[in-house]
C-alpha cells in the first residue's frame, strides 16, 4: 500500500528540514500556490548521461521546471562555476527550465524577508502562467496521486510514453 498524498507531502518536506531557507521558500511556494493538480518533488534526483547525480531543490515534472534555492554557500567563487556546470548538465539531461531564488544580495547579506517573499510571489505567478501555457498546448496532465503508481491505466491504453512521466512502485508493473 502506498502512503496517502498528505503523508507524501510531509515526507517530501522532511527531506529539507535541516536547510532552513530552502524549507521556508519551498513550503511557502507550495502553500501559496495551493494547486493540488501540480506534482512537486523536493530533492529530485537527476542522473546525467555520464551517470553524475544531482538533486534539484524543487521540481515540477509536469511543467518541465525545477528550482534551486541559492543559500550562502552558492555565493562562493568555486560554487558559482560548479553551479553553472551543474545547471547545464541538468538541463541537458532533462530539458527542464531552471529558476533560482537567492536569499542573499550582491553584498552577500541575507535579503530582507519581505524581499524574499516578493521573489516567491513572482515564482508563483510564473508557475501559474506556465501551467496555463501547458494547458493551452494540451501538454499538461494533472497530478493524480492516487493513480500515479497504478499500471492499469497504461495497460488499458496499451503503451507507455516518456512524456507522460509514468512511475511504478514495482518493476513487474512496467513489464
Q: Each predicted region: which residue ranges?
A:
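Nucleic-acid endo/exonuclease domains
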Residues: 1-175
Amino acid at each position: 500500500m502506498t502512503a496517502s498524498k498528505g503523508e507524501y507531502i510531509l515526507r517530501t518536506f522532511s527531506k529539507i528540514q535541516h536547510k532552513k531557507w530552502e524549507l521556508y521558500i519551498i513550503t511557502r511556494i507550495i502553500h501559496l500556490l495551493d494547486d493540488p493538480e501540480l506534482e512537486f518533488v523536493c530533492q529530485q534526483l537527476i542522473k546525467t548521461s555520464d551517470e553524475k547525480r544531482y538533486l534539484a531543490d524543487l521540481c515540477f515534472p509536469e511543467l518541465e521546471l525545477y528550482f534551486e534555492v541559492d543559500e550562502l554557500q552558492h555565493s562562493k567563487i568555486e560554487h558559482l562555476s560548479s553551479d553553472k556546470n551543474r545547471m547545464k548538465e541538468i538541463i541537458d539531461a532533462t530539458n527542464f527550465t531552471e529558476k533560482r531564488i537567492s536569499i542573499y544580495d550582491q553584498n552577500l547579506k541575507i535579503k530582507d524577508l519581505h524581499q524574499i517573499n516578493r521573489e516567491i510571489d513572482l515564482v508563483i505567478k510564473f508557475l501559474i502562467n506556465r501551467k496555463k501555457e501547458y494547458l493551452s498546448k494540451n501538454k499538461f496532465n494533472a497530478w493524480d496521486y492516487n493513480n500515479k503508481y497504478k499500471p492499469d491505466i497504461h495497460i488499458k491504453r496499451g503503451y507507455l510514453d516518456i512524456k507522460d512521466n509514468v512511475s511504478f512502485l514495482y518493476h513487474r508493473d512496467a513489464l
